[in-house]
Amino acid sequence: MPKPSHVGWLAKVGKTLKTKDGVPIEIWQLNHKPDADVLSEWAVHFRNHYCDDKQIDLLRKGTRLTRSEYLVNLKFPDANIKPGPSIRSGDFAEILVADYVEYILKFWVPRIRYADKTMRNESKKGSDIIGFRFQQAGKSSREKQ
């Protein structure tokens, strides 16, 4: 999958913090731009974490719901009823961090967590984000690719 355009809005602040153990932590921020094309692409990217566009018609079959109604009423966390807004915010942040890990740090990040949610207003239990870096012949897995 090509790098989504919104990932270009992520930028290092140029400041670092340190953990209690003295490990440096880079600070990044999202420099949002009012670009309708990038926002539309990002919306598709976000939506596809919950329900792949290629599967939505099959999944909503028999529900009598439009695509939009299916997503809003059955897949996405509720926008207004608690704890939906906090779940929505957390999901958004996790997806953005997964994009950072995959497209900036160059790890492979599985993207099935949100599609498998059984309760739309509940966080999926388990690992939030995991990234894999695969070994290439002749390199140890600790070497950057």
Give the role of each language-model region:
Residues 1-125, 130-145:
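Mixed-charge (Asp/Glu-Lys/Arg
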